[in-house]
C-alpha cells in the first residue's frame, strides 16, 4: 500500500523540462514541482502524456520521479503523492516501469492500455494485462483511459468496473471526456475507487457526476484556478464555479489544441521557464508564442488574482 493517501482534488500531470541540448533539466523539474506544491493542488503526476514519457528513457523517467519527490519534500509537502505514468506496449515492460516508479519515490502508477498491437489483443487479454500489472506492481494502480494516446482504444465503463474490484487497482483517469461513463463508474464502483476527469474543461461536470477531481495538464499554468472550481462547488457556490469553469475551459481548449507544446510555451511566457520540448516536437515560433500568450491572458489574470489572495 502507498504511504501517501490519494485524496480528491486537482492533480497536475507535469511537463518534462529540458535544457537546450535536450538533457533533463533537473533544477527546473524541482522548481516547477515546488511551485505547484504551494498552489493548493492535491498531487503531481509525472511521465503522463504532458510529460513526454515516450521521449524519455528508463533512467530519465526515474530521475524525474525522484527529483519531483525530492522537491516536494524540500518544501514540506511530504504527504503530497506522486503518481507515475508507466504504460508500455508489453505487460512485462509495464510491470518493470511500475517497480521502477516505486523505487524512485512514486506512490501510485497511472497505466495506459497497451495499444501498439491493438487488433491482436482481445478484450479479455486486455483485462488480464491490467490484472497482471496490478498483481505485480508494488504500488497501487490507476487505469488511464485516453483513446487519443492509445490508437483509439477506449475502455468502456464495463471494462473499468470489471477491474475496479482488484485490490491494487484504486482508480481511473478518464481523458476520453465521457461524463456518462464517469457517472456509471462512480455509481457502481466501491467508494474507495476514485474516478478522475482527464481535463479541467469538465471539472464541474466531473464533480456533479460524483468524480474525485481532475488530472489536468492546464493546471501546470493555472493551478489555483483549477482548484478554485472545486472549492466553489464544495461550498455550494455553483454559479460562481460555473463562471470560473468557463474561463478555465477556454484556456484548456488552447492546451488541447496545442498539446504540451502550447502548455510549455505559456509557462515560458508567464513563468520564464519550460519551453524546450524534445525533437521531433519543436517550440512555437515567436509569433505563435505571442499569440498563445495573448490567448492565455484571461486565465492568467484570474490565476494572478487568486495567487494574490
From Swiss-Prot:
Q: Which Pfam families match?
A: DHDPS
Question: What GO molecular function annotations does the UniProt record carry, in alphabetical order?
Answer: (4S)-4-hydroxy-2-oxoglutarate aldolase activity; (R,S)-4-hydroxy-2-oxoglutarate aldolase activity; 4-hydroxy-tetrahydrodipicolinate synthase activity
Keywords per UniProt: Lyase, Schiff base, Stress response
- Whether Nucleus counts among this entry's keywords is no
Q: Which residues form a coiled coil?
A: none
Enzyme Commission code(s) on record? 4.1.3.16
Give a short account of what the protein does: Catalyzes the final step in the metabolic pathway of hydroxyproline. Involved in osmoadaptation.
Tell me which family the UniProt entry assigns to this protein: Belongs to the DapA family.
Instruction: Spell out the protein name for this chain.
Output: Probable 4-hydroxy-2-oxoglutarate aldolase, mitochondrial
Organism this protein belongs to? Emericella nidulans (strain FGSC A4 / ATCC 38163 / CBS 112.46 / NRRL 194 / M139) (Aspergillus nidulans)
Q: According to the entry, what is the taxonomic lineage of the organism?
A: Eukaryota, Fungi, Dikarya, Ascomycota, Pezizomycotina
Amino acid at each position: 500500500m502507498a504511504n501517501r493517501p490519494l485524496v480528491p482534488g486537482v492533480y497536475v500531470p507535469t511537463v518534462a523540462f529540458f535544457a537546450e541540448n535536450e538533457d533533463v533539466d533537473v533544477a527546473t523539474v524541482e522548481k516547477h514541482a515546488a511551485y505547484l506544491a504551494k498552489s493548493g493542488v492535491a498531487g503531481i503526476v509525472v511521465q503522463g502524456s504532458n510529460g513526454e514519457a515516450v521521449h524519455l528513457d528508463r533512467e530519465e523517467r526515474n530521475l524525474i520521479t525522484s527529483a519531483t519527490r525530492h522537491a516536494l519534500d524540500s518544501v514540506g509537502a511530504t504527504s503530497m503523492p506522486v503518481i507515475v505514468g508507466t504504460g508500455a506496449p508489453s505487460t512485462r515492460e509495464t510491470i518493470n516501469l511500475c517497480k521502477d516508479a516505486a523505487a524512485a519515490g512514486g506512490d501510485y502508477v497511472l497505466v495506459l492500455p497497451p495499444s501498439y498491437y491493438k487488433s491482436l489483443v482481445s478484450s479479455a487479454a486486455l483485462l488480464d494485462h491490467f490484472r497482471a500489472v496490478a498483481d505485480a506492481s508494488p504500488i497501487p494502480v490507476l487505469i488511464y483511459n485516453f483513446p487519443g494516446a492509445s490508437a483509439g482504444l477506449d475502455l468502456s465503463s464495463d471494462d473499468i468496473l470489471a477491474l475496479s474490484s482488484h485490490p491494487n487497482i484504486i482508480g481511473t483517469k478518464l481523458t476520453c471526456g465521457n461524463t456518462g461513463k464517469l457517472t456509471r463508474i462512480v455509481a457502481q464502483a466501491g467508494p474507495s475507487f476514485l474516478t478522475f476527469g482527464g481535463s479541467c474543461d469538465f471539472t464541474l461536470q466531473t464533480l456533479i457526476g460524483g468524480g474525485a477531481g481532475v488530472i489536468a495538464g492546464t493546471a501546470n499554468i493555472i493551478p489555483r484556478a483549477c482548484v478554485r472550481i472545486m472549492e466553489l462547488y464544495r461550498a455550494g457556490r455553483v454559479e460562481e464555479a460555473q463562471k470560473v469553469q468557463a474561463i478555465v475551459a477556454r484556456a484548456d481548449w488552447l492546451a488541447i489544441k496545442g498539446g504540451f507544446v502550447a502548455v510549455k510555451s505559456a509557462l515560458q511566457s508567464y513563468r520564464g521557464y519550460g519551453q524546450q520540448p524534445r525533437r521531433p516536437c519543436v517550440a512555437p515560433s515567436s509569433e505563435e508564442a505571442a499569440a498563445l500568450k495573448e490567448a492565455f491572458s484571461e486565465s492568467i489574470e484570474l490565476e494572478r488574482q487568486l495567487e494574490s489572495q
